[in-house]
Amino acid sequence: MAGNTIGQLFRVTTFGESHGLALGCIVDGVPPGIPLTEADLQHDLDRRRPGTSRYTTQRREPDQVKILSGVFEGVTTGTSIGLLIENTDQRSQDYSAIKDVFRPGHADYTYEQKYGLRDYRGGGRSSARETAMRVAAGAIAKKYLAEKFGIEIRGCLTQMGDIPLEIKDWSQVEQNPFFCPDPDKIDALDELMRALKKEGDSIGAKVTVVASGVPAGLGEPVFDRLDADIAHALMSINAVKGVEIGDGFDVVALRGSQNRDEITKDGFQSNHAGGILGGISSGQQIIAHMALKPTSSITVPGRTINRFGEEVEMITKGRHDPCVGIRAVPIAEAMLAIVLMDHLLRQRAQNADVKTDIPRW
């Protein structure tokens, strides 16, 4: 299986399956001398891990990360950093009934078509369980970006089903189980989740991620544009079906006179572009949104076929999230951090000596 690595100078390679012994990743390109401990990674892993609220899957994994290499006496050595998380709460028997059945809306059918076989236990490699390692690697990038460049990366839920969520107060995001920045909508979200659990159904969501303090100049035209790499990274997250940068698809209804981000001596007067122009960061906030589909792991019966071509009824058992968008927030932050760190290292490698007299805000 190819496609397990992202990045060029800052490279992250993950391995492992949902019900395997462990998940792991190798992180290459981390500069030496950066203070790093397992505790630095654990905070974001705790934000993502399952079983932390009644609104997410009740699979209870501690997700305790171990640093296997690349750190000596509390600082990075510049060599490959090996990370490992053991799986401890697998219930593979929950999936024995579907070993020959293709769950609709999942990767069962496509994995078997591609490889001729599949790990049916929780989806195997296609499970979002894999994203725990992305979050661990992303925590390294977030620490580096914050300490060396003052870059802050934050994410939140901005829509669940037909409930839009305004970014009113970032401080509220960590104070509720929905990563919701709008305290006035918590009761509505709670009511929706209760209804979904009662119905045995699920719902989609929109997640927004914002990077502040990003310097101008990141991005490698033409095929490695910063927005292209961000879209690639976010689209690689399980259940993501759409990505927008800045105003995204809303620009279709705008005139050029409305959409252009005019510049005065005081700086940009708007940010419809989401902080990226011509594939290169402008120094404004980088803003990206991603749409996540409702999970197909529901108890509402549905039609499918088995590997023998017979039509069967499918009712998913096991422990699943009614809205996968909730736990996707720290994953989106991690993927944005990975892309930004990679591009910062690339910019430093090629253009460290470039100086301009153009104003920066």
From Swiss-Prot:
Binding annotation for FMN: 125-127, 238-239, 278, 293-297, 319
Gene3D superfamilies per UniProt: Chorismate synthase AroC
Gene Ontology BP, a term: aromatic amino acid family biosynthetic process
Pfam families documented for this protein: Chorismate_synt
Cofactor requirement: FMNH2
Positions bound to NADP(+): 48, 54
Cofactor binding comment, as recorded: Reduced FMN (FMNH(2)).
Reactions the enzyme catalyzes: 5-O-(1-carboxyvinyl)-3-phosphoshikimate = chorismate + phosphate
A Gene Ontology molecular function term of the record: chorismate synthase activity
Enzyme Commission numbers on file: 4.2.3.5
HAMAP family the record matches: Chorismate_synth (MF_00300)
Family to which the UniProt record says this protein belongs: Belongs to the chorismate synthase family.
Subunit organization: Homotetramer.
UniProt name for this protein: Chorismate synthase
